[in-house]
């Protein structure tokens, strides 16, 4: 299968502050990261699948820009014990990233003389290695309940564990749309998330329209709302 996605975040206007004007200079800057991804996955056997995603990343903060190419890769294996399966994945793997652009070096001290700065330090992308396990304690033609456990090992943060659950209910055999509710919690970061969605198959076609909503409680950023519209085939 082949997939394509476009991601964009609009953070709105951010006040510009300096050492001497901590409440704002009257200027604002915009922050807007976006990504374009192309993925390919293949089922090699009834139990084993693998895939890879190539991503072009663009970020801009005021006059600073950042461009880079990253990729994700993962494998998926069904154990043969009920519906249990596990997966291994690495995300945001790539070379060092370097910002470009020009900023004015303003402030006090010998290193803040108002000169323009156009050379910046390179840094590693936020690589994350994950191992996950999932199964369905309840599954039949009208409903399913999924539970999952995942180990997260990022290169820029402490290792943590994620717990997740999803319950899906089919409306009827005549109208096989699904209503879905989800919940999750990250142990170690004390972050929770929840969401809901509806997936509607198109009659006479092998397409499924998907509409999903999720809420994540990120301590440093507050609540984050995500709305997703998609089509699976």
Q: Over which residues does each language-model region extend?
A:
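Subset of outer-membrane beta-barrel
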Residues: 1-233
């Amino acid at each position: 299968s082949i997939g394509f996605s476009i991601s964009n975040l609009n953070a709105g206007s951010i006040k510009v502050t300096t050492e001497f004007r901590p409440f704002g200079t009257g200027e604002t800057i915009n922050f807007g990261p976006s990504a374009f991804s192309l993925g390919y996955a293949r089922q090699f056997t009834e139990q084993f699948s693998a895939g890879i995603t190539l991503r072009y990343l663009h970020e801009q903060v005021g006059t600073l820009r950042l461009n880079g190419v990253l990729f994700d890769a993962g494998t998926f294996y069904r154990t043969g014990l009920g519906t249990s399966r596990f997966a291994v994945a690495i995300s945001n793997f790539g070379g060092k990233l370097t910002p470009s652009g020009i900023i004015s070096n303003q402030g006090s001290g010998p290193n803040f003389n108002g000169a323009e700065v156009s050379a910046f330090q390179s840094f590693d992308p936020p690589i994350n290695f994950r191992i996950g396990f999932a199964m369905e304690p309840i599954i039949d033609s009208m409903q399913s309940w999924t539970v999952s456990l995942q180990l997260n090992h990022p290169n820029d943060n402490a290792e943590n564990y994620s717990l997740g659950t999803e319950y899906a209910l089919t409306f009827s055999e005549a109208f096989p749309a699904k209503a879905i509710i989800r919940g999750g919690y990250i142990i170690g970061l004390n972050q929770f998330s929840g969401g809901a969605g509806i997936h509607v198959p198109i009659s006479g076609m092998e397409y499924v329209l998907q509409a999903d909503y999720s809420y994540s409680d990120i301590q440093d950023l507050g609540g984050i709302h995500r709305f997703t519209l998609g089509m699976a085939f």
